[in-house]
Amino acid sequence: MAEYTLPDLDWDYEALEPHISGQINEIHHTKHHATYVKGVNDALAKLEEARANEDHAAIFLNEKNLAFHLGGHVNHSLWWKNLSPDGGDKPTGELAAAIDDAFGSFDKFRAQFSAAANGLQGSGWAVLGYDTLGSRLLTFQLYDQQANVPLGIIPLLQVDMWEHAFYLQYKNVKADYVKAFWNVVNWADVQKRYTAATSKTQGLIFG
């Protein structure tokens, strides 16, 4: 069975300073993300064993663990691509037009996305996603690593609101972290994801 692996980053840990510190990025990548990778591989191994033993209680437990850790791995893999030392500013082209159509303007989108991030209770993510059935952009709060995700959604942009993503630098002032996040958003990556979502996933659930 193929194992999940920790992806390399496209930039050095210090590259996002002063907006996100090198210390945070290094710990976030080598400790937190690595733990999710180990967790998903462990869950898969235990799930295989439980199935062989027809232990349904263990199957259900490890399916839950798999969902959590795989969610953490996927979310963080997207997170690193969503960030760039050359990021910031605003999107252009088709993505900019889609944001204007869905939210009224980029400033209104930014305010709504930031409110989703700052208003999150507990741990999770704020997400901009593409609804493959309604052919529209949506923002929503993702709880923990896998909960409250609308079906048929392709994530395009996410901000990590777990405390490990910001506390060493911003303490409990989440709003300052979210404000800093906009300075390193890799809009080229978000545009690439939007193009793929709109061209390859029509009616995702129904085929």
Curated annotation (Swiss-Prot):
<keyword id="KW-0464">Manganese</keyword>
<dbReference type="InterPro" id="IPR050265">
    <property type="entry name" value="Fe/Mn_Superoxide_Dismutase"/>
</dbReference>
<dbReference type="InterPro" id="IPR019833">
    <property type="entry name" value="Mn/Fe_SOD_BS"/>
</dbReference>
<feature type="binding site">
    <location>
        <position position="164"/>
    </location>
    <ligand>
        <name>Mn(2+)</name>
    </ligand>
</feature>
<dbReference type="GO" id="GO:0004784">
    <property type="term" value="F:superoxide dismutase activity"/>
</dbReference>
<dbReference type="InterPro" id="IPR019831">
    <property type="entry name" value="Mn/Fe_SOD_N"/>
</dbReference>
<protein>
    <recommendedName>
        <fullName>Superoxide dismutase [Mn]</fullName>
        <ecNumber>1.15.1.1</ecNumber>
    </recommendedName>
</protein>
<feature type="binding site">
    <location>
        <position position="28"/>
    </location>
    <ligand>
        <name>Mn(2+)</name>
    </ligand>
</feature>
<dbReference type="InterPro" id="IPR019832">
    <property type="entry name" value="Mn/Fe_SOD_C"/>
</dbReference>
<dbReference type="Pfam" id="PF02777">
    <property type="entry name" value="Sod_Fe_C"/>
</dbReference>
<dbReference type="Pfam" id="PF00081">
    <property type="entry name" value="Sod_Fe_N"/>
</dbReference>
<feature type="binding site">
    <location>
        <position position="160"/>
    </location>
    <ligand>
        <name>Mn(2+)</name>
    </ligand>
</feature>
<dbReference type="InterPro" id="IPR001189">
    <property type="entry name" value="Mn/Fe_SOD"/>
</dbReference>
<keyword id="KW-0479">Metal-binding</keyword>
<comment type="function">
    <text>Destroys superoxide anion radicals which are normally produced within the cells and which are toxic to biological systems.</text>
</comment>
<feature type="binding site">
    <location>
        <position position="76"/>
    </location>
    <ligand>
        <name>Mn(2+)</name>
    </ligand>
</feature>
<dbReference type="InterPro" id="IPR036324">
    <property type="entry name" value="Mn/Fe_SOD_N_sf"/>
</dbReference>
<dbReference type="GO" id="GO:0046872">
    <property type="term" value="F:metal ion binding"/>
</dbReference>
<dbReference type="InterPro" id="IPR036314">
    <property type="entry name" value="SOD_C_sf"/>
</dbReference>
<comment type="similarity">
    <text>Belongs to the iron/manganese superoxide dismutase family.</text>
</comment>
<keyword id="KW-0560">Oxidoreductase</keyword>
